Amino acid sequence: MLTRRTFASLAGLAAGSVLLGVLPGCAGPDAGQTAPAANEGEGLNSGEGGKDEMPPTSESAPAAPSAALSPGLLCVAEYANNTLAVVDPSTGEILQRIAAGQNPATVLVADGWVYVGSSGGGEVTAVNIADPSQVTSITVGKQPLGLCYDEAQGVLYVGDYFASSIHLVDTQLKSLVKTVKLNAQGYHNRTDPPDCCRIDPGTGRRTVALALAPEGGLLYCANYGTFDVARVDLATGEEIEAFDGVVGPRQILVSADGAQLLLAGVGGEGEQQVSDLYVLDRSSGKRVQEVPVGQSVAGVAQASDGSAVWAIARDDGELVAFDANWNETGRLPLGVGIDTLVLAPDGETLLVGNSIGGQVHVVDAPSLALLNTIEGLASPKGIAVIA
């Protein structure tokens, strides 16, 4: 079984050298690290998929944006290239690359724009879908990771890893309009991750992924630092009682029926290893189910009608499918290191990213048939699909 350290070693072999340095609707991390010390990068590996698992940053300049972004195209954050790659999933061709700030890690498509969390530069880059030459940089704090769009309010919520805050961006103004600070202490007064994942004590909640309640008004924030789920009342801008979470959270979703939260986490070492997808009651926060997936659950997706769920086991390298009753219906080996999972708007196509191998796999969701593998991406992190 791969540990954090052996996984990082494999990454170094695959990449040739290592750069310290990782999701849909409400996008979660693949989170990036600004510039931590070497031991900090190792510690965050277990919690966020290995920010020290990156190949060297490419020195190649992005091509000038050209044609409008057509429905069905993929937008992929290339962490090591500081670009947003636009990809045709059917041919695997990289059509263009757009400068997207330092260490882009998360991507979200909303309201005619592609939003990219530039985790190394404290900004969100907005790219106009109709005219990709229109690019706006929005300053949002220290390290934006989780992205979530509130269509009713016209607001983009941005989780700030190092500031333990949620920033609110007006998507019409393309400007920061408010910041909500999370409480210093989390669930049961936690202030730190477990020993497996701790670098510096008391470093804050460290939000990595967001999900919006379907009725609006409540934002769920999966936190690495206190391995819990903060709940923010958006009407008051105050945090209410937190839920217990998962060690090394990577993604949080509200279930299709609105009754549950689906929480994916990669865990740590020893007793902190995580091989199950956690299902929480959305009202009480009680963990009602632990669904076996495989070592280090790095992502989750659900069909819009709740009829199917998919999850990925990063260290086992498998995509796993379940029915509505959590019966396993299939597994597809894709290779160790898969760390991003997105269901396309068509509900029929899954995109699975491997930031170490520089790949995005295109998979038929109903059958788990591998349709295509896109190569040549520079540490692909967040993935979004133009609707």
What do these predicted ranges mean?
Residues L2-L19, C26-A387:
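Predominantly soluble domains enriched in secretory-pathway, periplasmic, or organellar proteins
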